[in-house]
Amino acid sequence: MTNYLHKLTMLDDEINHPLIHGQVEEINQIDHYVGNGKPLKAAPDKLGLLPDQFEDVLKEIGNNKKRKLTDINNLFNNFRQYLSLKYGIWSIANLKTAALIKDKMQIDTALEIMAGNAYWSSTLANVGIQTISTDSLEWAKTSSTGAEPFHPVINLEAAQAIKKYSDVDLILCSWSPNFGQSDLAAIDAWQKYSNAKHFIFIGEEDGATNSPEFWQRNWFKHTAALNEINSSFQSFDFIDERIFEIDNEF
């Protein structure tokens, strides 16, 4: 991921196609916002070329640029990895989604667990939600995650944080690991110790996030409010990232 943006710019200049220009501009804009510690106003546009788009662009630029087009498409598809390595974030929060969470779920206070560098916490705070960010900070020893938080992070394991900060309206967990059972332990702690009416997870069903057991349980809520929130949070890449709410009466 070294010189990621530089490689993008070079390939963009060589390919010289408006569809490619647009995606490179989108990536640069996201990088500008995140790099300056600011949340995006709305979810980013879709990145990467679908097979038919790839073929259409290739016809216009010539087959001699196929290698370059393949390379830049690979960079588009690896943008999330770039963000994780440079800024320690896997999920791109945005103000529109945060405002909908506040309004539709009637949230005034929130606790983010496994917060990493707390980009989601920062965004929730931006729309007026009093937010506490917590993380065990174990991975901060070996990665960028947590190295430069966007919001103050308290060193606390998830279940301990839920027990300590029990009087919040919302618990949020973004990109819980797809190994171990920390997500199940967090839900168990919520049931035992917390007064929070809402618990949401951000991730990919049966994919990049959460334990297999998490997805096998029949505890997901399906509400009009959640549908509206998710309509503002379409994924920007091939990962089907969405917001899931756990039923507190399962």
What are these regions (language model features)?
Residues 108, 169-170, 197:
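Conserved acidic residues
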Residues 134-170:
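S-adenosyl-L-methionine
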Residues 84-107:
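Conserved alpha-helix/loop element of class I SAM-dependent methyltransferases that forms part
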Residues 168-183:
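A short SAM/SAH-binding and catalytic strip from SAM-dependent methyltransferases
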Residues 181-250:
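C-terminal substrate-binding/active-site "lid" region of AdoMet-derived donor-dependent transferases
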